[in-house]
Amino acid sequence: MEKIDLNEYLASNEYPGRGIAVAKAPDGRQMFIGYFIMGRSENSRNRVFDPVPERGGICTMAADPAKLEDPSLIIYNPVLTLGRTHIVTNGDQTDTIYDLMSQGKSFADALRTRTFEPDGPNYTPRISAVVYADGSYQMSILKSADGNGDSVQRYFFDYPQPVAGEGHFISTYKHNGSPIPSFEGEPLRFACPRTLGDFAHGLWSSLNADNKVSLFARVIDLESGESGDMIFNKYDAVCSDLDDPEEPELLPEELELLKKLDEEEE
């Protein structure tokens, strides 16, 4: 499969829906994870990503709770961390994977208990990925048989030896439509940029301006296991900690400067 420019691909696609990108940095020492959501209806657009640090992930929440019409299928945990295993999905199957892997089951075992979303006639696919401590990863899509709500098709993709500077992308939809056609084929292979900033900003700026809602990006250091996150939200949250972040502690030099200013005022 030929490598694509993922940013160009997304820029030319009005509505890929929700998407997962996993890649190994060009230096081979880091893994990148990206997950975005889009929306066409007011209910789908009324969302933000909010950190859930105690579970090593994020949740979706209503930007304005007063405008929330139907929480099913749009309020869930897209990202959770189990030890040094990072789980990302487009629905509540994140918790299914987390719970069953906690019991010693596999990624595939967990997803064999699930099917596509019950939102006919679209029957939105469930897309999922898991990144392991050594940088290997797996992806999956659970979709209907060409819109047949009585038939599920489960696809799994293993990447045990990821190549530095490359990644794979999968989305719920092929493109916009009515009903919306599901993603087809294996995950798309793409060239990975050098830094998480380039990766995240490239994805966010490439998504359709009208339909994009939120983006999450994570970098994982393969040696230490430490990770760092970036979150982009198009809409402001109402009554959320996102509106009032904690002020970081002042550096010693900043404290010294304030002390001098106070002395001058006296």
Language-model regions: role of each:
Residues 1-266:
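Conserved short alpha-helical segments that host acidic/polar catalytic motifs at enzyme active sites
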